[in-house]
């Protein structure tokens, strides 16, 4: 069973989906106030730091929530960076990702299932492909104008990330378009479809 229609998201994404999408569609605020950064639980390449430095370079005055797992090899580096910047709130081993996505105006996140979680809640996103198995989905999201995408490589530089963040942050119409397009890709009911398919 393949495809985003069968993505196994946690139940809370479907539970809050209608409320979140309704709020996004009626939101007339053109400015971004809250940015969520989640480049996977471990983020072994420390892409999170590149993202934070890009935001600093752009002089974006917003609230930033960074999510990492306790297993992240660069956790202490990010913790030290956050301690020097009152904009940044670092959260470790969270169990309320749906609510964090609900509160965000835009996100910078990894590809894979987490990108479908963002789609489910209509969260405008810059998706950073961090593994080969994420390429196909990321390409689909880009073609359907759901997310903007930066492909990861060993030579991934902050310049590409900075441009992607700047475009998403400044372009209100782009964010509105993403909020409309991305929920069509994933509705959070994949678990129910899987159960029905195997019965």
Model-derived regions: residue spans:
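A nucleotide-sugar donor-handling region in carbohydrate enzymes
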Residues: 1-46, 75
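Glycosyltransferase donor-sugar binding loop
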Residues: 64-75
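A short, well-ordered alpha-helix in the C-terminal region of glycosyltransferases
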Residues: 167, 174-188
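Acidic donor-binding loop of glycosyltransferase active sites
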Residues: 102-113
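Short acidic alpha-helix that forms the nucleotide-activated donor recognition element
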Residues: 92-104, 119-120
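C-terminal alpha-helical cap of glycosyltransferases
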Residues: 187-199
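Nucleotide-activated donor-binding/catalytic signature segment of Leloir-type glycosyltransferases, i.e.
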Residues: 77-93
